[in-house]
Amino acid sequence: LYLENKLDFVKAFSPYLDAIFCTTGGEYLQKLKQPHLSVAYLPNVGHRNVETLQQFSNTNTDKTFIFCGVVYKEPEREKFLKDLADALEQGHVNYQYYGCFEQPGVYGKAYYKVLSETKMGLNYSRRNDVTLYSSDRIVQLTGNGLLTFSPRIPGFEKLYTEQEVVYFDDQFDLAKKIQFFDQNPEQAEKIAKEGWEKTRKSFNAKRITQFMVEVTFKQPLSENYEWSHEVYA
């Protein structure tokens, strides 16, 4: 929703809708508020038949850390990833990028094969300063049991605590934390397992579908959803 054309696209359909659900919260979500419909934040959805791995207990990985994504020709994003790569090389961390810096992307079955070979991954979206917004990497990584590193997205600790993902302040802080957890596998496993359990428990398809039905039909919320403060009816 932080892209104006996408916001306008959703608004164009809004007269025909009873409810709108978006993976963006805060001021951008509130721009969709209208008297005739409900607007609500929606977390990225995980499913146990899709996110099937338990990497926290996998001892046969050959990569310590991965990032899958593109640069989008954005200088700040490019610098972040280059600085991180330099720091990891200096720290002798076994890492791999996919989809950027002339490295081929991986998708579908090939993507899940990469996840199955990896201990840690980076949740890094195109924008990381938008309330509650993350790409679906967050459930792909945590839901498959990788130790997941994330920037401090506004409000995101309501979804995942510091016991469930590893938050970082910048690329240099991230590099230090990757090295730390590479050298402390028991602590890495503990957080990765907690993150996996949170995704399974809180962001599964059944629970989020239940939330959508309740909001759409203006029913009382049956649970204390972690994101229920972002419902505008």
Model-inferred region functions:
Residues 2-159, 167, 219:
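Nucleotide-sugar donor-binding catalytic core of glycosyltransferases
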Residues 39, 92-95, 164, 186, ...:
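Secondary-structure boundary/capping signal
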Residues 103, 130, 163, 184, ...:
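Generic anion/oxyanion-binding catalytic loop in active/binding sites
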Residues 160-161, 178:
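Short acidic, glycine/proline-rich loop/turn micro-motifs
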Residues 165-171, 181-185:
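Conserved acidic donor-binding segment of nucleotide-sugar-dependent glycosyltransferases
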Residues 177-233:
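C-terminal amphipathic helix plus adjacent low-complexity
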